[in-house]
UniProtKB/Swiss-Prot annotation:
It comes from Arabidopsis thaliana. The lineage of its organism: Eukaryota, Viridiplantae, Streptophyta, Embryophyta, Tracheophyta. Its main location: plastid. InterPro entries: GATase_2_dom, Ntn_hydrolases_N, PRibTrfase_dom, PRTase-like, PurF, PurF_N. Inhibited by the phenyltriazole acetic acid compound [5-(4-chlorophenyl)-1-isopropyl-1H-[1,2,4]triazol-3-yl]-acetic acid (DAS734), a bleaching herbicide. It holds the Pfam family Pribosyltran. This is Amidophosphoribosyltransferase 2, chloroplastic. Pathway: Purine metabolism; IMP biosynthesis via de novo pathway; N(1)-(5-phospho-D-ribosyl)glycinamide from 5-phospho-alpha-D-ribose 1-diphosphate: step 1/2.
Length: 561
C-alpha cells in the first residue's frame, strides 16, 4: 500500500482561513503558530452563513468523491471476520529524539492500526508540527520526514479504518490552534454520547468538518473557560461518555487521559534518561527501552512538564470495566495489559478449552497468528502435539482488490495455506480466538478438509460474541453476529466442522478471579456498562477526505470552517 502523506487531519485556529493546498505530495509538516492571529472568543461571534463554509478554493464538507479505492476490501468477508481494534497511541516527553522514538513505538503498535499513522512534535520555539499519512508506519515516515519533526515532546497514532469505504482518510493526531494556545490529540476509543455532544455544540455555533468523535474534544476545549490551559482538557474530558485513552500535547506539556471505566489500555514508562512515555501497550515501551512503571488508572489525568508528573482525577469514579478482548485478541502476546500477561491469559484459555471440551485428536493447530498461544495451551493440556498446520502469508493486506464476486473465496487461500503433511489423514483440532460472522471459519474448515484432514474440530478461545461493541472496537451490528442468530450446534453445521466448542463465559470469569468485576463483557452478554443511546460511530466514514489530501481547515472560537 502506498503511503499518502497528509496534513488535512489538522485543525488550525488562525483567524484567516487557509486555502486547500494544491500540492498533495508536500512532505513538509504543517507548522502551527505559537501566537496565531487574534480571533474572537467563543461568545463574541454570530453564526456565519452556510455559504461561507465553502468557496471556490475550499470545497464544502463533507466531501463525497468518487474514488476507485472504495473497491479495496469493500466486500471482503475474509477481512471482516475479526473484531478490529481501531487505534494505538503513543506519547513521549523529554527526549531529543522524540519523533524517532515515537516512530519506533508506533511500529510496535502496528497491529492496532494498519491503515494510517501520524506524529505531532513540539519544536524548541513552541511550534506544533505534524505529519500524517495513509499506510503502514514505515510507509508514512522516512528519515527526511522525521528530520522535519524536531523537539523533545511527541504524540503518535496508528489507525484502523472500517472496511467498505475509501481508505484515503485523514488520520490522527488532530491538531488545533486556539488563541490561547495549540493542542494535538490522539485517541483510542469511541464516545457513546458523541451525537448529543455534537448537536449541542452545533446548536451553540460550532461547525464541524469531520464526523469523527475525536473532533468533539477539540470543540469542547475551545469553549471551556477553565484555567490554566491544560485544565481545559480535563474540563472537556469530564463531558465525555464511553471509551477514551488519549494523549494530548500542548506547547509545553504532555497529557495522558483514560476514561473512568478504563475500557482501553494506556500504560506509562520511563527511559533511562528520564523521558516519560505513554503507550497503548507495554510492547511499545519494550521496543524503545522504556521501563514499565504502571497503568494510567481509569479516570486519571497525568500532566507531564518540566516540573515532573502531576495527577488529576476525572469525575465521577465508576467501577472499572476494561475490555476483555484485549487479552483475547487485540494486544500482542508479549504485552502486559490491565496488569496481566496477555500470553499467560491466552495460554490458560487454551488449557480451559482442552479441559472442558476435550476430543480425540492427532494434532492441534492454530489459526495464525491470534490463535497460536491458545492452541499451545490446548495442546499442552491435552498432551497432543502442536504443529503448524496453517501458514499465514504476511504479504496479503486488507487492501486486496477483488475483481469479481466469482473469486472472493480465494481471499482465505491467499492469506492462509494448509500444510498437507501435517493434516492429511489426521483428526485435527484447530484453535481460533473468536468467531464473528462465521464466514472465514467455514472457509478454513473447507481448506483443512481439502488438505486431507480426516476430522476437523474447532475450539474457540472466547465465549460466543452476541452483541456489538460501542467502546472503540469495529464489530458488526448485533444482527450480523452469527452467535446472536444461531446455537452452537447450528454454527457447527454452518461452518461444516465435526465439533465446535467455545470458552465458557463462567469459566472465563472464574479464571479472572477477584478482577472479574473489572472487565467489560458487553460483547458476550449485551450488558453495556455505559448504555449506548445512539448509533455506533463508524470509523469507516468518520473523515471528510474521501480521496483528497492536503486540506487545512480552521476553527475560530469554536467554529470549524
Amino acid at each position: 500500500m502506498a503511503a499518502t502523506s497528509s496534513i488535512s487531519s489538522s485543525l488550525s485556529l488562525n483567524a484567516k482561513p487557509n486555502k486547500l493546498s494544491n500540492n498533495n505530495n508536500n512532505n513538509k509538516p504543517h507548522r502551527f503558530l505559537r501566537n496565531p492571529f487574534l480571533n474572537p472568543s467563543s461568545s463574541s461571534f454570530s453564526p456565519l452563513p452556510a455559504s461561507i463554509s465553502s468557496s471556490s478554493s475550499s470545497p464544502s464538507f463533507p466531501l463525497r468523491v468518487s474514488n476507485p479505492l472504495t473497491l479495496l476490501a469493500a466486500d471482503n468477508d475474509d477481512y471482516d471476520e475479526k473484531p478490529r481494534e481501531e487505534c494505538g497511541v503513543v506519547g513521549i516527553y523529554g527526549d531529543s529524539e522524540a519523533s524517532r522514538l515515537c516512530y519506533l513505538a508506533l511500529h510496535a503498535l502496528q497491529h492496532r492500526g494498519q491503515e494510517g499513522a501520524g506524529i505531532v512534535t513540539v519544536s524548541k520555539d513552541k511550534v506544533l508540527q505534524t505529519i500524517t499519512g495513509v499506510g503502514l508506519v514505515s510507509e508514512v515516515f522516512s528519515e527526511s520526514k522525521l528530520d522535519q519533526l524536531p523537539g523533545d515532546i511527541a504524540i503518535g497514532h496508528v489507525r484502523y479504518s472500517t472496511a467498505g469505504s475509501s481508505m484515503l482518510k485523514n488520520v490522527q493526531p488532530f491538531v488545533a490552534g486556539y488563541r490561547f494556545g495549540s493542542v494535538g490529540v490522539a485517541h483510542n476509543g469511541n464516545l457513546v454520547n458523541y451525537t448529543k455532544l455534537r448537536a449541542d455544540l452545533e446548536e451553540n455555533g460550532s461547525i464541524f468538518n469531520t464526523s469523527s468523535d475525536t473532533e468533539v474534544v477539540l470543540h469542547l476545549i475551545a469553549i471551556s473557560k477553565a484555567r490554566p490551559f491544560f485544565m481545559r482538557i480535563v474540563d472537556a474530558c469530564e463531558k465525555l461518555q464511553g471509551a477514551y485513552s488519549m494523549v494530548f500535547v500542548t506547547e509545553d506539556k504532555l497529557v495522558a487521559v483514560r476514561d473512568p471505566h478504563g475500557f482501553r489500555p494506556l500504560v506509562m514508562g520511563r527511559r533511562s534518561n528520564g523521558a516519560v512515555v505513554f503507550a497503548s501497550e507495554t510492547c511499545a515501551l519494550d521496543l524503545i527501552e522504556a521501563t514499565y512503571e504502571r497503568e494510567v488508572y481509569p479516570g486519571e489525568v497525568l500532566v507531564v512538564d518540566k516540573d515532573g508528573v502531576k495527577c488529576q482525577c476525572l469525575m465521577p469514579h465508576p467501577e472499572p470495566k476494561q475490555c476483555i478482548f484485549e487479552h483475547i485478541y487485540f494486544s500482542l502476546p508479549n504485552s502486559i495489559v490491565f496488569g496481566r500477561s496477555v500470553y499467560e491469559s491466552r495460554h490458560v484459555f487454551g488449557e480451559i478449552l482442552a479441559t472442558e471440551s476435550p476430543v480425540d485428536c492427532d494434532v492441534v493447530i492454530a489459526v495464525p497468528d491470534s490463535g497460536v498461544v491458545a492452541a499451545l495451551g490446548y495442546a499442552a493440556k491435552a498432551g497432543v502435539a502442536f504443529q503448524q498446520g496453517l501458514i499465514r502469508s504476511h504479504y496479503v493486506g486488507r487492501t486486496f482488490i477483488e475483481p469479481s464476486q466469482k473469486i472472493r473465496d480465494f481471499g482465505v487461500k491467499l492469506k492462509l495455506s494448509p500444510v498437507r503433511g501435517v493434516l492429511e489423514g489426521k483428526r485435527v483440532v484447530v484453535v481460533d480466538d473468536s468467531i464473528v460472522r462465521g464466514t472465514t471459519s467455514s472457509k478454513i474448515v473447507r481448506l483443512l478438509r481439502e488438505a486431507g484432514a480426516k476430522e476437523v474440530h474447532m475450539r474457540i478461545a472466547s465465549p460466543p460474541i452476541i452483541a456489538s461493541c460501542y467502546y472503540g472496537v469495529d464489530t458488526p451490528s448485533s444482527n450480523e453476529l452469527i452467535s446472536n442468530r444461531m446455537s452452537v450446534d447450528e454454527i457447527r453445521d454452518y461452518i461444516g466442522c465435526d465439533s465446535l466448542a467455545f470458552l465458557s463465559f463462567e469459566t472465563l470469569k472464574k479464571h479472572l478471579g477477584e478482577d472479574s468485576r473489572s472487565f467489560c463483557y458487553a460483547c458476550f452478554t449485551g450488558d453495556y456498562p455505559v448504555k449506548p443511546t445512539e448509533d455506533k460511530v463508524k470509523r469507516g466514514g468518520d473523515f471528510i477526505d474521501d480521496g483528497l489530501v492536503g486540506g487545512i481547515h480552521n476553527i475560530e472560537g469554536g467554529w470549524v470552517r
